[in-house]
Amino acid sequence: MTISAYGSGAYRAATPNRLVSTRSELTDLERQLATQQRAESYGDLGMDRRVSLDLNNKLSTLDSWLEGITRGDVNLKIASQAVETYAKLTNETVNDTRSNTYLPSSTGRSAPQVLAEEKFKQTLDLLNSQVNGRYLFSGKTADIEPTVTYSEIIEGDGTGRAGLRQMINERRLADLGAAGLGRLTTGGAGATATIADETPAHGYGFKLAGATSSSAALTPTFTAGPPADLSVTVASQPAVGDTLRVQLSLPDGTQEEIVLTARAAGTTGPASDSFEIGADVNATAANLRASITAALGKEAATTLSAASSQVAAANFFAGSTNSPPLRVPGPPYDTATAAPAAGTAANTVIWYRGDDGSDHARSTATVQVDTAQLVGTGARANEEAFRIGLAQFAVMAVESFPATDANSQARYEAMTARVSEKLSFGGSAQKPAEIITELGTAQTSLARAKERHESSKNYLTTSLAGVENVSKEEVAVQILALQTQLQASYETTSILSKLTLTNYL
């Protein structure tokens, strides 16, 4: 009979389990040393799993905000650069249109007009800027190119939809009228000269606004109406140099004044600004009537023509998909009396194809930078500041001033004066600088949010590392301890496996 070593059976039964457990612990420590991760799953973190989940969720949210901020910042920088370039183009045009820039040419166009055409095209390119397939000036419809082509805007599409050139011609016909006197009628008899607004009253052409005389010899009587009328009586022979002044309101909101000066009998001078003193008051009145007609004709061909272009261009660029441009009813246009009515997408080019809602342009695209903070980064190509510039560039590009036309220089100067005034963005008109400021403010908001979130991310990342990560040094020490323990266990097990009572004794 063989007597087993005391307790060796119990030890052998327990030792394998302990060795397996220790070996498993060693394997896990080796994994921790390789990955620097405390656990492979949230469940293995024990009570720290809630902390880990919370920190990871917060970091994910911060990453989402930071990614949006990065994209938004790129969009804002490109949009801001586009608006700044546009502002420079408008300033250059103001300088180009200063006085004494008219030079007759075989093409009927001056150098500033050619430059304005190029600026118009460049502005369209700026407004069609896109980043990663997103158009920056299309409002909420970021997948739609906001403007049509230069050719389509100016000339129409060739299939019956009118462009700006046609709309300007229609408006000019309506303003000048069949007689070319700005829809005013002239007349009188004996010692009287008369001017009157057309009947029935309408919104085209000149509107009489008043009259004054430097002498009692010329007595004006003005009736405001509408329709307004003016009667001038030659009460006695005027002296050389006496003047009659007639004030006219134009459809673009400007005012002009006709000044007619009496000149000595037998002398010559332009009928559009002077009249000859006749043999008697009746003859003088007849000369005055002829001078009034000539002056109105010249004013209609120059300042009124320039005003017509402004009105038509403003109406054209105010048009959008939901609100097509206003057009003069017709043909015929030169006798039109009905107010301008909206065209349709079938007969009029709609230059702007983007979103044209009533909400603020900046709100059409937003970046969420915090739980309750949205930063507006949107823009629309049909914002007032852009419409004004496009209209002025287009007017200069469309107009022609033949060298053979005696009124070309006066009409050119009337055009450039209006272009320069409009491009000053005076009064309550939106200015490019306002858009630049708003986009700059949005950039500042994004930068501050980014700085704040990066600071928070660094703190949370450090906190998460304390929960999920391990120290290589500590793990290495634990591994050495376990290796020593395993080695001792293996040696002890080996010795005990050979132990018998005989060996023990």
Predicted regions and their residues:
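Short alpha-helix capping/helix-loop boundary micro-motifs
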Residues: 231, 360-362, 478
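Amphipathic alpha-helical polymerization modules
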Residues: 1-152, 402-505
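Polar, low-complexity export/assembly segments characteristic of proteins
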Residues: 26, 30-33, 37, 140-212, ...
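Charged, amphipathic alpha-helical segments
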Residues: 210-235
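N-terminal start-of-chain detector that recognizes signal peptides
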Residues: 4-6, 11-12, 107-110, 216-217, ...
